Amino acid sequence: MSLNYLDFELPIAELEVKIEELQNVSRAGELDLELEEEVSKLKEKSDRLKEKIFSELGAWQVSQLARHPLRPYTRDYIERIFTEFDEFAGDRTFANDPAILGGIARLDGEPVMVIGQQKGRGTAEKIKRNFGMPKPEGYRKALRLMEMAERFKMPIMTFIDTPGAYPGVGAEERGQSEAIARNLKVMASLKVPTICTVIGEGGSGGALAIGVGDRVNMLQYSTYSVISPEGCASILWKSADKAPLAAEAMGVTAKRVKELDLINNLVDEPLGGAHRNYDAMARNLKVRLKRDLADLQALSLEEMLDQRYKRLMSFGYCS
């Protein structure tokens, strides 16, 4: 499959094209020892180059990776981490919003509620999923599932990946801001373990609406910000061309957000990013989720809620 190489990955692309050409020769039955050694050397060179390039990424390059069209989405993680997923639909008020995917699943046999934003792959699915931008009915569906999880004492695991809540007229008329605010309020006091993970873009209130939890994690090349770099650049410099500068200034990367103590953990991605190896990324994330869940289940309800309250109240505190 084509990896849709980003600009900074072009040197890697050249090597990988050479590797693929040699492997095609191999598949044609013309492989000899000399050719096999050449492929091995090129792979080693490619890995070294990837390590060098990805160790020096700037905030804008990380933003590009967070939006990579082949990056694994919520459904990809559900298929690899959980079993027996049973999707629920509708907010019982207005409609079903395909931008929010949610339902009951099992994590190594334990029932959990899984909720996440879902972007689309092809044009038709992108339109169906509204490019991962939920409407009020999506957030109300998420709230319905979270309250159901609390009622049945199931842990909640959310996957955040959105450029932001949908800003259309219809969404505003149906109470977009109220839906987000209500989710924040309810999530702050849920009486079950809640683990949130930013898997791609964490866009403003649209991300926060399913992002209040006991543990908040970010994948290594995900982002979290109040506005997109392009949006910030358009406001401050009147030009979206300044997006790289805005990305650096806002500190959108997982590393920077962790330095500010706004999240709990970083989850390492495979060399070259999550889009290069879905299975390896899912394994890394599953380890993190199970560890977080075990830690939270070891606490009493009072201890868990107290820790959550203290964590939330520490945001924005300056000594």
Swiss-Prot record:
Residues 34-295 form the CoA carboxyltransferase C-terminal domain. It comes from the Bacteria. Its main location: cytoplasm. The keyword Cytoplasm applies. PROSITE patterns: COA_CT_CTER. Its EC number is 2.1.3.15. One of its GO terms (cellular component) is acetyl-CoA carboxylase complex. It is found in: Cytoplasm. It catalyses: N(6)-carboxybiotinyl-L-lysyl-[protein] + acetyl-CoA = N(6)-biotinyl-L-lysyl-[protein] + malonyl-CoA. Pfam families: ACCA. InterPro entries: Acetyl_CoA_COase_a_su (IPR001095), ClpP/crotonase-like_dom_sf (IPR029045), COA_CT_C (IPR011763). Pathway: Lipid metabolism; malonyl-CoA biosynthesis; malonyl-CoA from acetyl-CoA: step 1/1. Keywords: ATP-binding, Cytoplasm, Fatty acid biosynthesis, Fatty acid metabolism, Lipid biosynthesis, Lipid metabolism, Nucleotide-binding, Transferase. The keyword Lipid metabolism applies. One of its GO terms (biological process) is malonyl-CoA biosynthetic process. GO terms for molecular function: acetyl-CoA carboxylase activity; ATP binding; carboxyl- or carbamoyltransferase activity. Acetyl-CoA carboxylase is a heterohexamer composed of biotin carboxyl carrier protein (AccB), biotin carboxylase (AccC) and two subunits each of ACCase subunit alpha (AccA) and ACCase subunit beta (AccD). Component of the acetyl coenzyme A carboxylase (ACC) complex. First, biotin carboxylase catalyzes the carboxylation of biotin on its carrier protein (BCCP) and then the CO(2) group is transferred by the carboxyltransferase to acetyl-CoA to form malonyl-CoA. Belongs to the AccA family. This is Acetyl-coenzyme A carboxylase carboxyl transferase subunit alpha. It comes from Pseudoalteromonas translucida (strain TAC 125). The lineage of its organism: Bacteria, Pseudomonadati, Pseudomonadota, Gammaproteobacteria, Alteromonadales. The gene is accA.
